[in-house]
Amino acid sequence: MAAYQISYDLRKQKDYSSLIERIKSYGTWCHPLESTWIIVTEQTATQVRDYLKAVMDNDDGLLVTGLRGDGAWYGLSDNISQWLKNNL
């Protein structure tokens, strides 16, 4: 299983519901910042990108980055901090 950070910028209608539904479908996820999510999955970054971009407009932006266990953060809730410690 790998952890991926997902960042996005929806430029037109900013309808996040379909994208968020797809992100949450991974089951193991965290939403630490407004446009940033972290998921844990057996898929590759390319597979995650392709699955998510299917509900995005052509001018939206999406970045899926693999996380390798090292991380630092500031100003996040205790629940999110604990999730990160458990899953990174």
What are these regions (language model features)?
Residues 1-30, 36-43:
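Extended, hydrophobic alpha-helical segments
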Residues 2-3, 45, 54, 72:
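A sequence-composition feature that detects small, non-aromatic residues
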Residues 13, 46, 74:
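Loop/helix-junction capping segments adjacent to catalytic residues or to phosphate/diphosphate-binding pockets
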Residues 17, 42-56, 84-88:
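Positively charged, polar, low-complexity stretches
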Residues 19-21, 37, 52-54, 77-79, ...:
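Surface-exposed beta-strand edges and their flanking turn/coil or helix-capping segments
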Residues 25-31, 55-62:
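A common structural junction motif
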Residues 32-37, 63-67:
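A generic structural motif
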Residues 56-88:
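C-terminal structural segments of small proteins and small subunits
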